[in-house]
Amino acid sequence: MATLRAMLKNAFILFLFTLTIMAKTVFSQQCGTTGCAANLCCSRYGYCGTTDAYCGTGCRSGPCSSSTTPIPPTPSGGAGGLNADPRDTIENVVTPAFFDGIMSKVGNGCPAKGFYTRQAFIAAAQSFDAYKGTVAKREIAAMLAQFSHESGSFCYKEEIARGKYCSPSTAYPCTPGKDYYGRGPIQITWNYNYGAAGKFLGLPLLTDPDMVARSPQVAFQCAMWFWNLNVRPVLDQGFGATTRKINGGECNGRRPAAVQSRVNYYLEFCRTLGITPGANLSC
């Protein structure tokens, strides 16, 4: 019995020691708006802690160990949402210099080289009521970041591994001889998505899905249709929520490199626009 009591005592001491270590290295406090204690780092994802995950690459404030410039904290009142100020018209946010800077990275061997244009993007955006007034700069940075990732930095306008993507549907039946593989900057797929997008936009996309790959304006319109329907409702939850809506299969540690690719695009565009990214960047 004495041996058993000693073993239990040692196990309890070890448990308390583990809790102490965890308390020193992992913190759930969000620092996007409130900041961290003086001895803690604010991570790229907006949480306080002391390990390399907090103080390394992307560290916003505190005793950062990364050699890169820390990301500024979210200003008071900005919260983590992508619909927060600052705002401006779509033309003033997506300037020729900003858009051309994105497209300058499209390689000469890319199938979509020269396909996506600023004129098409602006025209597509202005066909939606949501973008006819002023828009949140964070939302546009997030939108272009997700479009960049999905299209391979705007290298592609059509999916490489093409399939039929035909699902039985009474409302949007497949047209014989037509395939509904990914097209456009967000790679819209399946007959029911082409049908619903076409109905909303007033375009015959169910019978002519290739229109998305022929017209840059239609390509952006389809992507923005998907964005407004599925992504825009979660803008107040931060950039990570947009990734979950577009491809939730990457989240919860399943495809961290893909998630980070999206985050990197977003941070780059935020820097270009001179805005802070907000909190909750990952999913």
Curated annotation (Swiss-Prot):
PROSITE patterns: CHIT_BIND_I_1, CHIT_BIND_I_2. The active site is at residue 150. Belongs to the glycosyl hydrolase 19 family. Chitinase class I subfamily. The lineage of its organism: Eukaryota, Viridiplantae, Streptophyta, Embryophyta, Tracheophyta. Residues 88-283 are annotated as: Catalytic. It is an enzyme of class 3 (hydrolase). It comes from Arabidopsis thaliana. This is Endochitinase At2g43620. Residues 29-66 form the Chitin-binding type-1 domain.
